[in-house]
Amino acid sequence: MRLARLLRGGTSVRPLCAVPCASRSLASASASGSGPASELGVPGQVDFYARFSPSPLSMKQFLDFGSVNACEKTSFMFLRQELPVRLANIMKEISLLPDNLLRTPSVQLVQSWYIQSLQELLDFKDKSAEDAKTIYEFTDTVIRIRNRHNDVIPTMAQGVTEYKESFGVDPVTSQNVQYFLDRFYMSRISIRMLLNQHSLLFGGKGSPSHRKHIGSINPNCDVVEVIKDGYENARRLCDLYYVNSPELELEELNAKSPGQTIQVVYVPSHLYHMVFELFKNAMRATMEHHADKGVYPPIQVHVTLGEEDLTVKMSDRGGGVPLRKIDRLFNYMYSTAPRPRVETSRAVPLAGFGYGLPISRLYAQYFQGDLKLYSLEGYGTDAVIYIKALSTESVERLPVYNKAAWKHYKANHEADDWCVPSREPKDMTTFRSS
């Protein structure tokens, strides 16, 4: 309750100082006197930084920055400007959620994390990039913020579940929450990407097994290797639960460079998250659909690299789902799973929330790809992951708070402009002439 008022300007906190001048837009705003130097508290800071659009980076830019003369000072100057902008943009949208959702303890907790992280970042806006102690403290702050936000996804999911249990869901609220969560989680993925890159490059704790990685990015990500890893781990879970599991049939075609291993510049953990989730779904459907037969058809995976796209198609024979249910699989508000407890980051991520598919789709869309489902009811389902083959085209997809976004939350959703068929058969006898 207090946090909602805080973001809306109902309560003031300690004054925060001038804005960073790392970009022309922020610098000019500060120089013209329109910056937040004279404003008090979090609301003024959020309003100021939300006026600026986030700066999307391409995979190539991430790669070039980390591999060619990686400079901690440059990263410091960019992140102290960019992170507040990304945080503020999504914080403005959080404040537009229904009041009853904002009052849930879980959403309050998420808001407190974002406020604290924003304030910690703004402590560096006037500090010199030439001061070694400042650079060290900033990296330490970045790692602390990253760890603080570990449980953002399940905690926000818990808040939505709390709201749903207490107040139910109407179509308008469901549509707005779906719109918000897609943008909120995409923002979270992007913020974590920046935090991870800085902490892995300059935090001194890079994994020895990932020496060729540039932060969290593998310049030569072996797609088939990641797919096999996801399959084996999903298979272990399937064997534990069903005491059996379907085999994997994998085929790869490198149409771009025939005969060579399929490799792309990508974040292996993102690809792993997607294929692991799809394997779990495919295995469960296959085991349950063929339970009475005792013979389980294999899961087929085709990997193709073309000039523009890397495509991964996973096909199962798990019985499929009706067309009308496909959209529900990506709906955050639809999950019928029992509410799990959010305890620590060591818990199985998103277990029980039904968020696996929508979050996986966001990972695919983050660098301009996509994830789509095509189902043949009674037979099985094809899941297709699209990834940009060129690192120059793999550019972050970032939400921006603007008038169009504001209107989406505030617009009155009118009646459908298409006829809605009746659930009951029409009694045609009423139209008979006497």
From Swiss-Prot:
**Where are residues bearing Phosphothreonine located in the sequence?**
336
PTM annotation (Phosphotyrosine): residues: 136, 241-242
Task: Please cite one Gene Ontology biological process associated with this protein.
Answer: intrinsic apoptotic signaling pathway in response to oxidative stress
Question: Which residues of this UniProt protein bind ATP?
Answer: 277-284, 316, 335-336, 352-357
User: Any idea which GO molecular function terms this record carries?
Assistant: ATP binding; pyruvate dehydrogenase (acetyl-transferring) kinase activity
Q: Which residues form a coiled coil?
A: none
Q: Which family does it belong to?
A: Belongs to the PDK/BCKDK protein kinase family.
The protein's assembly and partners: Homodimer, and heterodimer with PDK2. Interacts with the pyruvate dehydrogenase complex subunit DLAT, and is part of the multimeric pyruvate dehydrogenase complex that contains multiple copies of pyruvate dehydrogenase (E1), dihydrolipoamide acetyltransferase (DLAT, E2) and lipoamide dehydrogenase (DLD, E3). Interacts with phosphoglycerate kinase PGK1; the interaction is direct, occurs under hypoxic conditions and leads to PDK1-mediated inhibition of pyruvate dehydrogenase complex activity.
Its recorded name reads [Pyruvate dehydrogenase (acetyl-transferring)] kinase isozyme 1, mitochondrial
Species of the source: Mus musculus
Q: What is the lineage of its organism?
A: Eukaryota, Metazoa, Chordata, Craniata, Vertebrata
